[in-house]
């Protein structure tokens, strides 16, 4: 791609209207966690900035992150790849292969040195000179380091890239590790998850593409807008936790009624992610909503914290029946469950009122 176009020019080329372009910019602004005041800046950047060149490398992994990426709904992955970035190299998404494909990688690195965004999916294999993960006939470690040297910014997609992934589980026979110790001082944003949420992946690359800088990061190099809250804090089952109402096994009445999964091993109280906010498949669902406890897949070394159904050590203070009203307010649309909870609440109120009445009579005797 000799003459790179702007995002606006690509919209025009595809016959899309100005209205569609503005709507896309508004959606991107929201996705990136920016205020409505930033819409004009996003529009301006999308109008004039050339599409960013992106190189996507695959290390020791399962391509699950790519599979997640192509399911992004806002923006659509197809729109992103065809109209919003210039994806020059990707093992999974590119049509080319073989020696010409590898030659194109090296040509792109030289042509856009210091300008391209490098996305890395997968771990680095360190044992036996990296022979357990080969790419283009070479150890992936060598290719990754060469390409990383010329990158403007690096995105570590998935828990394999950020901390080694499943293949790093004890005893880690391949010596798999995250990429950060091998990329030098190049700015890097970590996007953990097994896999990450699709819109988190697209949101991060678009932030760098439009503003030329990494998004605000936390102490672990993760974008704050997507990893600023615990799964526990945004969970729709949280009122049950506060009320002390827990499923004891996967087929009891509590589980069927949607009670808290803490006692079944849920890692939500210690896991930072946007699962409860963004969810998956256009906001349809996420593991906890499907009845499975969070396994903490954005946490480093989560794969060794097994069994996943084992309860975490005591966390905070559970609620009591007096707090059940909180659950009622949050679960007003859950039909039978809300009715059952409301009944308990009313009984508690009656008992409390009766106790207060008896106490008052005693004081007046």
Locations of regions flagged by a protein language model:
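N-terminal secretory signal peptides
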Residues: 1-16
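N-terminal export signals
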Residues: 20-42
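Juxtamembrane/start-of-transmembrane alpha-helix segments at the extracytoplasmic/lumenal side
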Residues: 316-328
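A conserved mid-domain beta-alpha-beta active-site/ligand-binding segment of alpha/beta enzyme cores
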Residues: 201, 206-279
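Metabolite-binding pocket within alpha/beta catalytic cores that recognizes anionic/polar moieties
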Residues: 46-51, 59, 66, 77-193, ...
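Short cysteine/histidine-rich metal-coordination sites, predominantly Zn2+-binding motifs
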Residues: 278-287, 308-319
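Alpha-helical transmembrane segments
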Residues: 332-346
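Cytoplasmic C-terminal tails of single-pass
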Residues: 351-365
């Amino acid at each position: 791609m000799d003459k790179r176009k702007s995002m606006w020019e690509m919209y025009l080329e595809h016959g899309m209207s100005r209205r569609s372009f503005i709507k896309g910019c508004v959606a991107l602004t929201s996705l990136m966690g920016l205020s409505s005041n930033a819409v004009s800046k996003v529009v301006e950047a999308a109008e004039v900035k050339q599409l960013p060149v992106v190189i996507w490398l695959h290390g020791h992994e399962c391509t699950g992150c790519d599979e997640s990426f192509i399911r992004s709904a806002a923006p659509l992955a197809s729109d992103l790849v065809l109209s919003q970035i210039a994806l020059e190299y990707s093992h999974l998404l590119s049509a080319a292969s073989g020696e010409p494909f590898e030659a194109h990688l090296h040509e792109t690195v030289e042509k856009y040195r210091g300008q391209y965004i490098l996305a890395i999916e997968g771990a680095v294999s360190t044992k036996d000179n990296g022979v357990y993960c080969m790419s283009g006939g070479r150890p992936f470690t060598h290719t990754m380091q060469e390409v990383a040297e010329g990158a403007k910014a690096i995105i570590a997609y998935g828990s394999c890239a950020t901390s080694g992934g499943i293949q790093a589980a004890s005893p880690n026979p391949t010596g798999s590790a995250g990429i950060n110790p091998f990329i030098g001082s190049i700015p890097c944003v970590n996007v953990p998850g097994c896999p990450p949420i699709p819109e988190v992946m697209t949101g991060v690359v678009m932030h760098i593409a439009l503003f030329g800088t990494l998004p605000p990061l936390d102490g672990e190099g993760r974008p704050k807008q997507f990893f600023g809250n615990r799964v526990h804090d945004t969970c729709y089952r949280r009122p049950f936790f506060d009320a002390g109402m827990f499923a004891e096994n996967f087929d009891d009445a509590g589980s069927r009624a949607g009670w808290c999964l803490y006692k079944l091993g849920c890692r939500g109280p210690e896991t930072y992610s946007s699962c409860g906010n963004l969810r998956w498949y256009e906001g349809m669902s996420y593991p906890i909503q499907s009845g499975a406890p969070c396994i903490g897949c954005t946490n480093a070394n989560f794969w060794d914290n097994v069994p996943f159904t084992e309860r975490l050590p005591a966390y905070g203070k559970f609620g009591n029946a007096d707090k059940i009203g909180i659950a009622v307010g949050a679960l007003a649309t859950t039909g039978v469950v809300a009715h059952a909870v409301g009944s308990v609440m009313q009984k508690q109120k009656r008992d409390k009122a009766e106790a207060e009445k008896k106490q008052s009579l005693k004081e007046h005797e």
